[in-house]
Amino acid sequence: MMEVTAKLRGAAISAQKARLVADLIRGKSVAHALNILNFSNKKAAVLVKKALESAIANAEHNNSLDVDDLKVSTIYVDEGMSLKRIMPRAKGRADRITKRTCHITVKVGV
């Protein structure tokens, strides 16, 4: 079985939120997966769709695979780098805020 990979690294969303969307399309055909992502109102859906479209383009251009036969064989979301930020609070105190990122990996295959 031929598998083609696309990675979106450093996506500006937490891995926990992106996994909710990734779970929706795992194992689906790419046409059905794109349909699900188009009608999802989550921010992560836009990012996952971008990675999926990249994987489809890689399969079509680099490996000459037929798009109609492709399905999402594997999709996983790993934690990326976290940016540490400071939120000033009352009486001279400060809280730490972590702006989380993630790496989205999509594999499509026949």
UniProtKB/Swiss-Prot annotation:
Function recorded in the entry: This protein binds specifically to 23S rRNA; its binding is stimulated by other ribosomal proteins, e.g. L4, L17, and L20. It is important during the early stages of 50S assembly. It makes multiple contacts with different domains of the 23S rRNA in the assembled 50S subunit and ribosome.
Organism of this sequence: Acinetobacter baumannii (strain AYE)
One Gene Ontology CC term in the entry: cytosolic large ribosomal subunit
Subunit structure and binding partners: Part of the 50S ribosomal subunit.
Superkingdom of the source species: Bacteria
Family as reported in the entry's similarity comment: Belongs to the universal ribosomal protein uL22 family.
Name recorded for this polypeptide: Large ribosomal subunit protein uL22
NCBIfam families per the UniProt record, alphabetical: rplV_bact
GO MF annotation: an example: rRNA binding
One GO-annotated biological process of the protein: translation
Keywords carried by this UniProt record: Ribonucleoprotein, Ribosomal protein, RNA-binding, rRNA-binding
